[in-house]
Design a protein with these regions (language model features):
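S-adenosyl-L-methionine
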Residues: 1-124, 175, 219, 223, ...
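Glycine-rich adenosyl-binding loop in Rossmann-like folds that engage adenosine-containing cofactors
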Residues: 39-67, 135-174
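Short, well-ordered alpha-helical microsegments
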Residues: 91, 112, 138, 190-193
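Hydrophobic packing residues within well-ordered alpha-helices of enzyme cores
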Residues: 94, 115, 144, 193-197
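Conserved acidic-Pro-Pro-aromatic motif
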Residues: 98, 103-104, 171-248
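Short, hinge-like loop/turn segments at secondary-structure boundaries
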Residues: 120-122, 144-150, 200-201, 224-226
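Conserved SAM-binding strand-loop segment of SAM-dependent methyltransferases
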Residues: 125-132
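Conserved acidic residues
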Residues: 132-137, 185
């Protein structure tokens, strides 16, 4: 949903108290260290986690929106491709529920070692690519901008630091057509995949976080219009995270 003024007034104070708390962040980083959720353990051996952000691990509000729609909707019928592996939180939950091998993309090389460690320790079956998934063969490299927050590597939020990532054409991925679910947390690149979703005929289920800090009202309207055009209907949402299913 698009946050209106009333929503911001009600939600933002609670968000910063639980999800962005400096004092709790200190406790989590130096005393607890790892992130524990249900029977999962996640190591946080990553640079550039802002100290207040550690409180989201303490209160288990990390990736709350995405987690909710994944836990409510993923089943053993889903064979998932995850864009944005992060610390492995969403991939691990997805694998635990579906039981099916994952394809995971993570463009930030600094996260790969920690991500692999978490996926292995939580007994996931997966194929991990330190590349950028693209729809068109002609796309060779893509520029992504870096920030002081490991969560905010983006092609859309411009900073003075950037990396160029090798693109991987989707048709070069073995058994790609057998995967029916796309899960996207890509700091604005959800627009790219949704814009070109017509080329991914095998994708029947689409989960994504919509970044309102990047997209204006007209951009959001175009995204929703394109989903409708390609027979995707909304089935669930939690704040700015959505689940759409293709209905033919």
């Amino acid at each position: 949903m698009v946050f209106n003024r009333l929503t911001k007034v009600l939600i933002l104070p609670l968000y910063y108290l639980l999800h962005h708390n400096f004092i709790i962040g200190l406790i989590q980083k130096f005393l607890i260290k790892n992130f524990y959720y249900k029977d999962f353990t996640f190591f946080l051996n990553i640079r550039n986690i802002p100290l207040p952000n550690y409180s989201s691990f303490f209160f288990r509000t990390y990736e709350y929106n995405d987690r909710k729609i994944i836990e409510r909707n993923i089943t053993k019928k889903n064979r998932c491709i995850v864009i944005g592996g992060g610390i492995g939180f969403i991939p691990c939950i997805t694998y635990k529920i579906s039981g099916n091998k994952l394809i995971i993309f993570e463009i930030n090389s600094d996260l790969i070692s920690n991500l692999n460690k978490n996926l292995i320790s939580n007994r996931c079956k997966y194929k991990l690519y330190n590349e950028n998934l693209v729809i068109f063969k002609s796309e060779k490299l893509k520029k992504f901008y870096l920030t002081n927050d490991f969560l905010a590597t983006s092609s859309r939020i411009i900073t003075n630091k950037f990396i160029k990532i090798k693109n991987l054409y989707f048709k070069k991925i073995k058994n790609f057509k057998k995967f029916n679910t796309l899960i996207i947390d890509a700091e604005g690149d959800e627009q790219y995949y949704i814009k070109n979703i017509k080329y991914l005929k095998n994708i029947k289920h689409l989960y994504f976080e919509l970044h309102h800090n990047i997209f204006g009202k007209k951009d959001v309207e175009k995204i929703m219009k394109n989903l409708k055009k390609n027979n995707f209907k909304i089935k669930d949402k939690c704040f700015n995270s959505f689940y759409f299913r293709r209905e033919i």
